Amino acid sequence: MTAPAARRPSLTQSLLPTMLLGFMFLAQSAMAHESGPSMAILGAVENVKIVEEDVALEARMDTGATSSSLNALNKERFEKDGEDWIRFEIIDPDDEDARITLERPIERIVRIRRHSGESQERPVVRMEFCIGDRRLTADTSLIDRTALTYQTLIGRSHMAGHILVDSGEEHLRAPDCPADDQ
């Protein structure tokens, strides 16, 4: 006498556990997404605004750069209220021949070793930029970027947790931040 053939589960029975796990994962992902802040999607190049001076600049959104950098000309260190500060100029985006003077406390000085082997000191300041609808503050190195296409480079330190970059797009969102008191 032969043993009865084992009954094979139906397609529905075999897929049901997998489908339930999938739905649970999707529900959990949706809840996590709703509970956290939404991420703004921006292009590889965007207009950003230096909040304190209300100056709009075109910036490269660079996910490959750890920190942000700003084209700074005629840098001059000085002391104010017992702290080290720096005065520098940026090119006026409305008039290439004009300059706008900014002053910030120096957070630190970083030494960068260049490809040529020489090292370069760069002052680092805290900068608040309006990027899309976000006011984001992060350390920004001051360097001469006049030979580069963009005066401003926004790195991951400014974008992390707030911005996703679509590298195939540009100028997706103009700077439009709420006032300081909101």
PLM features: residue spans?
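Bacterial N-terminal signal peptides
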Residues: S14-A27
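Pepsin/retropepsin-fold aspartyl endopeptidases
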Residues: A32-Q182
